[in-house]
């Protein structure tokens, strides 16, 4: 991933100061950066899939969801695209608001579809199950509990695939989302910043 184009210094500042601004309705313009996210999908949809992941990183949620859905339409066997849809529908993890009830319903439908399709690789299945932890028992769990479950799932994902920089970056983002105002040590923010700083040194 070209992290510089994803404004990593800005993400670090956001982690230390406040929630990022999500682009819910706008269309992306300018460079989104590059993503390397290997999949078992048809090679013809790989560029669009990686562009959708770039949109997810850049908080371009409406355009990203549309692109993930187009990928799934063009390759109905691309189960990992359902992970992208469910991830987009969680909304901005740094804002603390989480998915809407309608978004959660749509996300669960996407997750169920991904499970039905069956990802061709264990890594892709693990990504789908990681995002699924956030939506489990959605109606009966508070947002903070969902955020903690999500962070733990992505931490496990990053540990299981130590060469997967995407897993590390998503864990850093979701871990930052667990920071509370009561914790004046800012442990979650600092841990996430450390992960992202390592990635920035790797991809200056």
Predicted regions, residues:
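Bacterial N-terminal signal peptides
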Residues: 6-17
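Short coil/linker segments at helix-helix boundaries
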Residues: 23-163, 168-204
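N-terminal secretory signal peptides that target proteins for export/translocation
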Residues: 1-4
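Sec/Tat signal peptide C-region and signal peptidase I cleavage site
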Residues: 18-22
